[in-house]
Amino acid sequence: MSNPDALPFLTEMTVADIISKQAKHGVSFNRRNARWYVHLLKEIIVNIDRELIPLLPKMRLDGSTYMKPFKKSGALQKWPQAYCDRVGLKREDIGGAFTCVEYVDFDPSKDARVKEALMDEGFLPPEFNVSKKPWNTFEIKKDMRKYGTYQAWYTAWMRGNAKQKQTAEMVDADIKKFLEKHFRFKTKNYMKAYVFGLGLNPNRRNPVTFDEIKKALATSNKWPTAPTNLEETLEEGLGGELGSVGSLLKRRVVAAHRLGLISGLIAKEREDGKLSAEANSCATPTFRFKHRIVVNIPSRGLFGHECRSLFESDYNSDSDHSRPFVITNVVPDGCYIRKGTNVIYEKGKPGKKDKPVGAYKYYIPAGKEVFLGYDGSGLELRMLAHYLIKECRDMLAEAIEENNPAKKALAERGLASAIMYRDILLEGDIHSHNQKLAGLPTRDNAKTFIYAFNYGAGDAKLGSIVGGGADEGSVMRARFLAENPCIAILIDRMTEKAAQGYLIGVDGRKITMRRDATGKVMVHKALNTLLQCAGAVVMKYAMMFLNKWIEKDKVRCAKVIDMHDEGQFSVNRNDVQKLKEHTELCVKKAGEYLNMECPLASDCQIGLNWMHTH
């Protein structure tokens, strides 16, 4: 019997070798432009601060406490006198022991202060860092439903056995600390943010009560501490509408992030003017890459294009690169070149504007190679379509074998909806389809919804897409699953399989499931884990096929970046067409090799730097 782990093992070894060569070769980095962008970002931050700081409340700083501020002569001691001189107090203003208190201008560089100010302005963070609590919530939830209110539950447990009493005391003490920190002397908007973080809707008609807040805290062992993924959240436009102050804060947060990112890249530059695009190809439970140095490079938003443009093709001193030349991109179906411009536009739907998707021609200076990038086209949704069909077919086969008519009917209905989902994905507009099924107001909402859904977002996160909370998210989830029986089948089957502690990937590898603090398998992450792993594995096989073809045809190129579902190359001008043909077929070949139920495809773009190719 062949070893089922042999193929995945050899795959990971081959991929690790390819990535090792990529890191050693490095990606060319435009240090000159990077330093200029650092200067521009500092100017932007200074200008924002000049407008922003006067609009924000001053920060209170508590200093030392002086129990004996006076000398025997009656004059102030050295440090109390220094404090009085600094804040403008006179000797006669001091009557005895005191604590130094100062009010200084708001400091936008302090992350915690900025988060608090954003929440004061109405920002509702969809994601929070959490602190884990030691109690088991199963019994608490059961009894909370029984008693109805937090106070009734607390009273009952205080009269219960020793373990219940100890737990109730611990829960109540922690709740009091939480309320003191986040609900005492805080603005209404700030409190709304933490209500939202607890999965409650702060904007509903009937206000949220403190009993509901206490119940939410008692029945969860993960409490929100501070907003996380702030830059990403603000860039995606999540978290609700912000006023003028909030918008300035948002712009400053993003600018500071870009400044830190580019400064960090400059510090990592090698002597040869390149950056090592290192990655551990097998460092996560889902077998996705874990990157170093070249990581989380934005492609849109403030200075997003500028960040990507810093990664360029290599210099080449060969004679065939001695002159500048112009490369031409292919105009995709449904796109056109706007008259009098060099911009490719995608035709919008009725009532929608056409949007620019890239340039038609690029000027390549003398001595420079071409930058070429490819990525998996609609990869995550194709992975979803594959598993929808596969699991419904497996369920149908089981039903026939078991002679179970009810199970067979459900499987047939699920398979029909799965095949329809795949057909719309390949030939129609899947996001408009998802918009209709989930009852969402816009197509953009649908795009955000399906990716959040696939990544295992909770009801609160889903609800935030339409400006609501956990209740709205729960309704959207229920409606989407009801309209897609195949997705409900997939989730149920994966949840059941994940309970054993692992899932089986597309190439037969075991995917170890994450566990919580108590050691319990986190089965609610099964779909997210499965889809992430499938996408990562497919792109690894595509990488191997591509590498094999490159070596066979002796294509003069070097792989310089690999980022999840995309790969970037620096390629000799005369070999661009060869490499382009291979990149457009490698993902399709990987799908066929792995017997995917949904055909796979890849897109390829060429240019001078990473901004042009993705």
Curated annotation (Swiss-Prot):
GO MF entry, a single one: DNA binding
- PROSITE patterns, alphabetized: DNA_POLYMERASE_A (PS00447)
Q: Which UniProt keywords apply?
A: DNA replication, DNA-binding, DNA-directed DNA polymerase, Exonuclease, Hydrolase, Nuclease, Nucleotidyltransferase, Transferase, Viral DNA replication
Q: What's its EC? A: 2.7.7.7, 3.1.11.-
- Its catalytic activity? DNA(n) + a 2'-deoxyribonucleoside 5'-triphosphate = DNA(n+1) + diphosphate
Asked if the Swiss-Prot or TrEMBL record annotates the protein with the keyword DNA-binding, the reply is yes
Can you cite a GO biological process for this protein?
Answer: DNA-templated DNA replication
Q: Which Pfam families match?
A: DNA_pol_A (PF00476)
Under InterPro entries, the record lists: DNA-dir_DNA_pol_A_palm_dom, DNA/RNA_pol_sf, DNA_polymerase_A
Purpose: Replicates viral genomic DNA. This polymerase possesses two enzymatic activities: DNA synthesis (polymerase) and an exonucleolytic activity that degrades single-stranded DNA in the 3'-5' direction.
Indicate the family of this protein. Answer: Belongs to the DNA polymerase type-A family.
Checking PANTHER family in the record gives: DNA POLYMERASE I, DNA POLYMERASE NU
Protein's recorded name? DNA-directed DNA polymerase
Organism of origin is Escherichia phage Phieco32
